[in-house]
Design a protein with these regions (language model features):
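Conserved beta-loop-alpha segment that forms the PLP phosphate-binding cup at the N-terminus of a helix
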Residues: 81-104, 120
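N-terminal "arm"/small-domain region of PLP-dependent enzymes with the aminotransferase-like
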Residues: 1-64
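Conserved N-terminal alpha-helix of the aminotransferase class I/II PLP-enzyme fold
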Residues: 46-89
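Conserved small-domain helix->loop->beta segment predominantly found in fold-type I
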Residues: 282-359, 383-403
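Active-site PLP attachment segment
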Residues: 212-250, 256-267
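PLP-dependent enzyme catalytic core of the Aspartate aminotransferase-like
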Residues: 349-481
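Conserved PLP-anchoring active-site segment centered on the Schiff-base-forming lysine
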Residues: 101-117
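Active-site phosphate-binding strand-loop segment of PLP-dependent enzymes
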Residues: 139-200
């Protein structure tokens, strides 16, 4: 197929060039009705912010340019079908899981999953079996699930309705999935992979393999995370014979907006085009990787920080992700480092107790040199600050192989109450506790609360982490059943 084509974007552009007069929604009327002080920022994009006009197709019943754009994406990724998502990978996870899982179905789930996976399991009233990721204490980060642990769970629960994996994790760390997928398929179990951070993996080595290349049945990717797509723009890929496509499409129609953003969908068309052009230029990919490697090397040479990576041979890192760790005696935590970098207008993806995570661009046209100078300046200033917090107090993340203490169905029938932290140990959590980003719950709804949970939550609060948990959590309280 001709991957240089951009059917949806081209059609939108042609519509704009005809200088149309809008008597349809949205109410800004191609940008004519808009607050004057904001117009300069929004005017260009509002010109193509239209609705399902003749020739512009319909996301929920595509037959024209949207269908063509999705077909080009499917061709690029080598899958049966690709769907454009306008509600992020969240809706991809929800629709994928609901399409294969029903009430009381057993589902094998990687524990360090996004909250949207857990919301889908709750909506389905499923029975999740959680597999804990391994933890690398040398760099203080989870490195994915052990293949043998997942295969053991499949053999223990051969009638499971799905295996749900997260690969890569938020830090860009991946593991080989083919062994898991092959065993799951031998048991007629579909595999769903949340590959939100890996839309670019089909570029090939040195990037990790994409789950679409290892046979996963449903693969969800946030195009907006690493490709040049607008926020919330994502892809859902389908392949194999285990998926009921009619059921999947029902949930996509039910869960996504009936008024999808045309600029957002056009950006997915353009992101696919960008990736296809890059994939066809191996020399350009090599040059890009060399630039990223050089940036990391120079970053690692800045006093006060170091670039860290897992050393195990069985994991592979995404070249677009960089974990930096504070090493100066006056820089105690990742949160402290993140705040200081922001003083020089360097904005990172996330901080945790140990690291700051940077997401690098899929382009050499980026102010790498200017960024290095700003980071150096921020580090010079932070070296003269003081903090009394001892990072060694932080215990490892409290993941473990587990099932829920009570089922989702039972939760609907039980009353919630709020108790102080000290009274919560041994009780069942009635609300999740979620550091955000990355959106991975420390404590699951329905999980038995332990002292390790509370210690970790308390440490994060002391460090000033952003945690989704409601007002009760701010008052050192938890909701329990």
């Amino acid at each position: 197929m001709d991957q240089s084509q951009t059917p949806l974007f081209t059609k939108l552009q042609a519509h704009y060039l005809r200088k149309p007069i809008s008597f349809h929604v949205p109410g800004h009327k191609n940008g004519r009705v808009f607050p004057e002080k904001l117009g300069s920022l929004f005017s260009a994009i509002l010109n193509i912010d239209v609705t399902e006009l003749r020739g512009l197709d319909d996301l929920h019943d595509p037959e024209g340019v949207i269908a063509e754009s999705q077909y080009l994406a499917a061709n690029l990724y080598g899958v049966n079908k690709t769907y454009f998502l306008v509600n992020g990978s969240t809706v991809g996870n929800l629709a994928s899981i609901l399409s294969v899982v029903s009430q009381d179905d057993i589902v094998i789930v990687q524990r360090d999953c996004h909250k949207s996976v857990l919301n889908a399991l709750k909506m389905a009233n499923a029975r999740p079996i959680f597999i804990a990721p391994e933890y690398d204490g040398n760099v203080n980060v989870c490195t994915g699930v052990n293949q043998e642990d997942v295969i053991k769970a499949i053999k223990q629960y051969p009638y499971a309705k799905a295996v749900i994996l997260t690969n890569p994790n938020y830090y860009g760390i991946t593991r080989e999935l083919k062994g898991i997928i092959d065993v799951a398929h031998d048991h007629q179990i579909p595999v769903i992979v949340d590959e939100a951070h890996g839309a670019h993996f089909i570029l090939g080595d040195p990037f990790p393999k994409s789950a679409v290349q290892t046979g996963a049945d449903l693969v969800i990717q946030s195009a907006h995370k690493t490709l040049p797509a607008m926020t919330m723009g994502s892809y859902l890929h389908v392949q194999g014979t285990f998926i009921n496509v009619d059921r999947l499409e029902f949930y996509l129609r039910a869960l996504q907006s009936s008024s999808p953003s045309y600029p957002l969908m056009a950006s997915l068309d353009l992101a696919r085009f960008y990736l296809a052009q890059l994939k066809s230029e191996k020399i350009q990919v090599r040059s890009l990787v060399q630039s990223l490697t050089q940036f990391k090397k120079r970053l690692n040479g800045i006093e006060g920080i170091k670039v860290v990576s897992p050393m195990e041979s069985y994991v592979k890192e995404d070249p677009l992700k960089v974990m930096i760790e504070p090493v100066h005696s006056c820089i105690k935590t990742g949160y402290n480092l993140q705040k200081q970098l922001e003083s020089q207008q360097i904005y990172s993806e996330l901080a945790d107790p140990f690291h700051v995570l940077l997401v690098l661009p899929l382009s050499e046209q980026f102010p790498f040199e200017q960024s290095l100078q700003k980071i150096k300046k921020a580090l010079v200033e932070i070296i003269n600050t003081e903090t009394s917090f001892d990072i060694n107090q932080i215990c490892p993340f409290p993941f473990q192989n587990t099932t829920l203490a009570i089922s989702y169905e039972e939760m609907h029938l039980l009353k919630k109450r709020t108790v102080p932290f000290e009274e919560a140990i041994g009780k069942v959590a009635a609300s999740p506790v979620i550091p955000y980003p990355p959106g991975i719950p420390i404590l699951l709804e329905g999980e038995l609360i332990t002292k390790r949970h509370l210690d970790y939550i308390s440490h994060l609060q002391e460090l000033g982490a952003k945690i989704q948990g409601g007002q009760a959590l701010s008052n050192q309280q938890l909701e329990v059943f």
